[in-house]
């Protein structure tokens, strides 16, 4: 009986320790996210920077927290499997550049909005959801950042990486996937890459 009691107590201790680690991980990620936001806000408010320099600094600051490569892969769905390595590399490069330009332009339009973290929690194994409100005088936008933890660390990247962003319930990744799927029903992947080059 005493042996069973000890095993139960050990199991409880392990569970409490695991919960403590999980809470610490969520807290660390939340603080890291807010630190990044503060960093970007300082860049945006720096009037000594030209627009190109400002956007370059924004991209440099945000890139380590995004898994643009995974986003590129997921956006193509089954078409990804049909590509050789050279075409995969080319598409990823074009997609990453497109995403960087999109994020820098959106952030560059910042006008004293306030970012508030409303919730952060594990959604499933190696997945975390961080929900925020972007508060301005006119409106409040709910923006959700979805993180995953790569099995292997990626050079010059954070441990937890954003692989999708939802703005007012609309997933950027799903929107890209739907757009690319419709395009590829009548055109080739090479024509899609030509369009991305033109942008």
Q: What do the PLM-derived regions correspond to, one by one?
A:
Residues 101-141, 199:
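Surface-exposed, charged secondary-structure patches
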Residues 8, 17-25:
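Sec/Tat signal peptide C-region and signal peptidase I cleavage site
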Residues 77, 109-114, 182-184:
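Juxtamembrane/interface motifs at transmembrane-helix termini
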Residues 25-106:
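Early exported N-terminus immediately downstream of N-terminal targeting peptides
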Residues 95, 119-121, 132-136, 147-149, ...:
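A mature extracytoplasmic/lumenal domain signature
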Residues 1-9:
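Bacterial N-terminal signal peptides that target proteins for export
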Residues 164-199:
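Low-complexity, intrinsically disordered terminal/linker segments enriched in charged
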Residues 142, 147-175:
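Short beta-strand edge/turn micro-motifs at domain boundaries
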